[in-house]
Regions:
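N-terminal secretory signal peptides
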Residues: 1-8
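N-terminal export leaders
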Residues: 10-29
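Acidic/histidine-rich, surface-exposed loop or edge segments in extracytoplasmic proteins
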Residues: 43-52, 134-138
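Extracellular-facing binding/remodeling surfaces
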Residues: 73-78
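Acidic/histidine-rich alpha-helical segments that form the ligand environment
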Residues: 128-172, 188-192
Length: 218
């Protein structure tokens, strides 16, 4: 199912179509200042400041991150700490988990660190949210939404800064020792995006189970 907050509903689409036939939408469009397509989340492709393929990758990452932010934008601290059952993860913990996984791939692809050679400082900061489970259930709580958004933003800013230093040859470089088999940096960072998409689905499910949650069409 398409994200309902990203794409128009059938009813809204029909309304828009009717407006177009009368020329009203054209007048509205003409009255708006022009926007650069480079800033549109719905344009996947090269972006200024990056090599062609890295820019395309960042556009996919930005679209997915926007979907996550849409999912959590109205959540209170109580919502973020909500535990569905004794083995579930909270939404707050999942948000830190996203940052932890991205930080791991920073260490791996930017600094050449494998999973068994991570610095102790990294393990202390990110080990628990990477693994989740009982330690995360006990420790990752009591924070408002801004706390989690700042963690995500700081991590993403580092990723983008490092991407700007690199080219498509780096993106295509193959790690022959990766556990999945020969894997290039492009695949690793696409996995970061895919991983975020999976957890966004989990976040939406948990939202639907919050006390007092209204039925959703997502």
């Amino acid at each position: 199912m398409f994200p309902s907050e990203c794409l128009p509903s059938r009813r809204n689409f029909l309304k828009t179509t009717a407006a177009l036939t009368t020329g009203l939408s054209r007048l509205t469009i003409l009255s708006q200042p022009a926007l650069s397509e480079d800033t549109w989340l719905t344009i996947v492709g090269p972006k200024k400041g990056y090599s062609a393929e890295i820019g395309t990758l960042t556009s996919m990452m930005a679209f997915m991150r926007d979907q996550v932010l849409r999912s959590v934008k109205t959540l209170s601290q109580q919502d973020l700490d909500f535990l569905l059952d004794a083995k579930a993860n909270t939404i707050g913990a999942l948000l830190v988990h996203l940052a932890a996984i991205e930080s791991f791939f920073q260490m791996n692809t930017f600094e050449g660190k494998s999973g068994d050679k991570l610095p102790e400082a990294f393990k202390e900061k990110w080990g628990m949210p990477m693994e989740l489970g009982e330690p995360a259930r006990k420790s990752i709580k009591g924070n408002n939404l801004d706390h989690y958004l700042n963690v995500l933003q700081e991590t993403r800013e580092k990723t983008l800064a490092e991407f700007r230093k690199r080219d498509d040859a780096w993106l295509m470089a193959v790690d022959k020792d990766w556990p999945w088999g020969p894997t290039n940096n492009y695949c690793k960072w696409f996995h970061v995006t895919e991983h975020e998409a999976n957890h966004n689905g989990q976040i939406k499910f948990l939202k639907s189970r919050l006390p007092g949650a209204k039925p959703s069409n997502e």
